[in-house]
Structures are given as structure tokens and as C-alpha cells.
Amino acid sequence: MKVTANGKTFNFPDGTSTEDIGAAVDEYFAGQASAAETQPAEQQEEPQQPEQSLMQRAGDLLTGGQSAGQIAEQAGRGLVNIPFDVLQGGASLINAISQGLGGPKVLDDVYRPVDRPTDPYAQAGESIGGYLIPGAGVAGNMAIGSVAEAANQQGDFAGNVAKNAAVNLGAQGLLSGAAKLVGRGITAARGEIAPEARQLIDTAESMGVKPMTSDMIKPGNAFTRSLMQGGEGALLGTGGKRAEQYAIRSKLLGDYFDRVGGYNPDDIVKSMTSTVGGRKNAAGAVRDEIVNRMGSAPVGTTNSINAIDTNIARLEKLGTSADQRLLTALKNLKGELNSGNVDFDLLQQHRTAFRTNVQGDAMVFPNQAKAATNMVENAMTRDLRNAVGKSLGPQDAAKYLKSNSDFANIYNKVLNKRISNTLNKARSEYTPELINTVVFSRKPSDIKRIWSSLDNKGKDAMRAAYISKIAEKTGDSPAKFITEVNKLKAQSGGEIYNTIFSGRHMKELDALHDVLRQTARSDSANVVTQTGQALANPVRLGAAIPTLGKSLAAEAGYGLAMRVYESKPIRNMLLRLANTKPGTPAYERALNQAATAVRPLLANEATRQ
């Protein structure tokens, strides 16, 4: 397989990976640049006085000797080509990988306005660039950015050289990264950011959170993760932005907790009592309306008398072992019904009084008495229903039967007996723990029963209960919040979450959860506080003095490179690339935009620092 890059044709075995092609091409050009630096310079005409060595001229430049101004100007003039070398190196690598994949040549050759300098002072300028940036010996002129402007900048020339070289070192790294992105292959159809990514970015930015590139394009292996982590701790790197991101996310979480409000268990009990009580009153109103229409019409009591006689006979067989309270109540009721003139309303009153007389002051209804009471009550209800059917018709009879049942058992019907008993006990004893056993039930059926019995205030209290429970476990930690929300979503297949957080409340929580999850790197980023960073930088500056700034400039270049990579423009360009089909005009435009945007962005970051 043949690959042409920067006028040089390479032969690779079929099946060679794009990563290996890129590495080989990069290594070849780096070697050429290193060899060129080691070749002896052209012989100059011998001056009348001994000529200074290259490093002596570099020393004059650093110490500000008598000819420093002239040296700086000539060094700057000699270095004017370096930004074009950087772009050409990146373009060659991108083209090599693209062609290795069978694609077209993506970028044209970069125009170089000036031949390689031979002036010794210009060479001294290049040497200073390489001296301050250890990486220059490997990457050659591709690694060193344009420092020609250093001659016209305010301040120390050597310091400006270090900063500008750091800028261009970052540019070279980003271009290489863009080339590798091409080599991995990108699948999509249009030169736009994917809709789901755009929506997430818009949502995050509306909340004040700025997603970084590595938030949207996750590092895929240990090496790329280490690059990201290194950038967070490097001088002029992304640590400050990560710390700012974390602070905003924590504030978002606190604001959400405040907006939802605290949880008061009594609000839920009152809401259910009010709602269910309203249903009971409605059922009672239907029943009362039928009673009024029935008036004083006489009612047959055949079913009632038969049920009473059956239970009296059973009790009398027991002799002295029989429940005397129940036996007396049955005989008294039979006497009242046999007295005649029993109308509809009077039969209803007898039914209510009978249960009260049998139960008395007992907290628990005796099983034998309960069975007999239910049998007699049901018989009396049949007599009442038959009377309504004869006087008002079958529809009113059915309506009466339902309203009567709802009035007597509304709590058990709406909530179920277990929940109703628990809430009744909690209300009488005011124990939040009992209420919480119902509110935080792990049974979706219980939650749905409760939810349907709540008014809007009660539903707000129910949501507050769950959010308050999450807040207790998470504090102001977005990472813990994400974990707890994930647990709630997974509980009972999501039925409980979908019931409590429906509609706009679900959209709000989901949006917050998605933004915090997408930017979760700031929770574990290797960042330091402003005080720590302020102490760290003087230490780094002091440590860099013995090496004349080598380590400092290299770290600054790396930090700036990662800072720009994580910026909004580069993030959007790479997302656009990730959603664009290779070889299309839209792809070429997106790639060119990414390449040409790197240099000014890096320079701007350096200026801001």
C-alpha cells in the first residue's frame, strides 16, 4: 500500500493500521528535521575578528548584550516560516493517513514564504527555541511555533520565546490529534453536530455549565485518559476550568434541592385524608339523595329477619359459652324489625346501630361476632336495595349500593387495607416512621395507589420526600447524586420513578441528571484550589531556573494544548467531524476549520494567561 505525504512516497504492507501509518510518517519527518539540525551550517566568510559560537549568540540574546536588539530582529526574521512548517507537518500527516485509508488528499501543501534561513543570528533564534523546548529535538520545526513576534513584544524576549514556543508546541500536538481522528474513521451523513449532542450542550449551557471536549468525546483508552488528566494538572492547563465546572455543578444541585423544598410527612397524610375524605363525602351525598327520595316508604325486612334467626339459633346451641352481648343485640334488633312501620331511613339507622352495639368498647372485633354481624348487615343491605329497586328503579338501586359501599370502605378501596391501617395509626400517633413505610414502599402498586389519592400539594410533598432522601445521602456531591438517581430509576423497573416524576418534573430531573453525568469528569479531576495553584506556580518557576525554562515551557505548551482542545470551538469542530462522512466537501471544510482554528486559539489562551 502506497502513501504519499509532503512529496514523499511510503510503502506499507497491506492491512497496516492507520495508527501505525501515522506513527511511521511522524517519525520519518521528525528524523529528517533532527538530521537537518545536526548538519553543519554553511561556511560563512571568515570575519576579521573571531566569530561567536551559536550558543554564545544565544547567551547574548538571553542576557541582553549590546547586540541583543539586532540579534532579536534577525532571529525573528529567520523564524517567520515556523508556523507554516507546523501547518505543513500537520497537513502532511493528515493527508498520509487519509490516503492510506483509500481517501482523497484532504489538505493542500502549505505555502512557505521564506527559504530556510542561513543567517547565524537567525539560527541562534532557532537554537533558543529548541533550547527552551526539549521536545524540539524530536519534532523539529513542527514542534516549535512562530516566535518571530517575540522581537516586537513587550517584556523579556526569552520569556516571550518560551511562551510562543509553548503555543506552537500545543498547535503541533493538536494537529497530530486531528490527523489520528481522521485515521480512526468517522461515520455519519452531515457536516453538523449530532442533534442529541447539540441538545445536551444547549441544556448544559442554559444551566451555566460549559461541557468540555473530553466531556462530549470520552477518552477511549488509558493513554488518552492520562493525557486528559495531565492537562488538568499542568501549568496553564485545564485544572482551573474543571474546578469552575465543579463549583457550578454543585451550585446547580443545591439550587435544585432548595427549589423542591423540604419533606413534611404530615403533608402527605393530610392530602390523602382530604382527597379520600372528599370521595367519602361524595359517596355519602349520593346515598343521602336516594334516602331523601325514598322518604318514609315501608321496607320489607324478610332477608334481615332470616339472617337474625339463623345466628340466634347458632348461639343458643352454645348455651353458656355463647357471646351474650351478640345474642342480646340480635334479639333486640329482631324485636325492633317485627314491631312494624319500618321505613327506609329507619332500617339504615338500625343497621349502623347494630354494629356499634355488638363491638362496644372492644378495640378488636371478635371473629365470631364479626361473622354474625357481617351476615346480618348484608341481609339488611339487600332489603334496602330491593326497596330502592321497587320504588326508583334498578339504576338507582345499583347507585345506592355503590355509594353505600364507598362510604363505609373508601380508605380500604382507595389505598388497600394495609396502607389504610398504617396511615390511620400514623395519623393518631403522629409517627413519621410509619408514614415513611408507606411513602417509600418498594411496591409500585402501593405507590400508584397513594399517588392517585393525593392532591397537587400532596404530590409535591411525595416528590420532596424522595429528593430529600437523595439529598441526605449525597450532600453537595454531584457524583453521589448521579448514583442515587440511577438507583431510583432502576428500582422496580423504573415504575416508581415514572410515577412520582412524571411530566415536567421528570424532564427537569432528567435534564439535571444528564448534564451532571456528562460532565462527571470534574468530580474526579486532578484539580487544585486557587490557593494551591497559586503556591504551585512559584515552585514550578523556581524549579525551572536551573534548566533555563525547559520543563516550564514544555509543561506550558502541553497545558495550553489541552486547554484549547477542551475549548468550545474545538469541541464543536470535533463533534461536527464526528458527524460527517469522510471524503465529502462538508468533511473537508470541517477539517480545515479545525486545523486553521488551532493557532489563534492557542495564542489567545497564552495572552489571557
Swiss-Prot record:
Domain of life per record? Viruses
Q: Where in the cell is it found?
A: Virion
Q: Which gene encodes it?
A: 16
Q: What does this protein do?
A: Inner capsid protein that plays a role in viral DNA ejection into the host cell.
Residue ranges that the Swiss-Prot or TrEMBL entry lists as coiled coil: none
- Keywords, ordered alphabetically: Late protein, Viral genome ejection through host cell envelope, Viral penetration into host cytoplasm, Viral short tail ejection system, Virion, Virus entry into host cell
Q: Name one GO biological process term.
A: symbiont genome ejection through host cell envelope, short tail mechanism
Source species: Salmonella phage P22
Protein name according to UniProt = Internal virion protein gp16
Q: Where is the signal peptide?
A: none
What broad taxonomic lineage does this protein's source fall under? Viruses, Duplodnaviria, Heunggongvirae, Uroviricota, Caudoviricetes
Sorted alphabetically, the Gene Ontology cellular component annotations on this record are: virion component
Q: Where is this region: Disordered?
A: 32-52
Main localization of the protein described in the UniProt heading: virion
